[in-house]
Amino acid sequence: MSFKKRGQASLALSLAICMGAASAHAADDGLITKPSKYSVEETVARFEAAVKQKEAAGFTVFTEIDHAAAAKKFGLDMRPRTVILFGNPKVGTPSVIKTPLVAIDLPPKALVWEDDQGQVWLSYNSADYLFNTIYKRHGAEAPAATAPIEKVLDEMSDQATK
């Protein structure tokens, strides 16, 4: 292979690795992070709209917390970071009734944030992590199948970021 072709192959491999790093990924800690092509404000609005489209299935947006706005009140500067509390009370409420301490971790949250390079991201806990780690630590009973909930989370996050 010529030097030029090796260089092109190396460049192609480097680009593929970089592109893979920019796509959605789930860390070992259950956190799923997806890049957004929108601003923080638009990603928040799109995620909340996606959750509201699932109202018939029981999903709702409870509130949002704008960390940057709160920091500004105290003279602190931070890049945009907004937490959205959302969930499905049909699923979460029975768990909270039966195991009150699970409420410290419910409702689920999504974080929309901007990194130092200006890239916007949406992060949330996977359904598997929520039910098999968080519920487990409280001794709460988890649903038998997490895949359908994971699919809904994936759809909502894709709608917000793509």
Model-identified regions with their sequence ranges:
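C-terminal partner/receptor-binding element of secreted or periplasmic proteins
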Residues: A127-K162
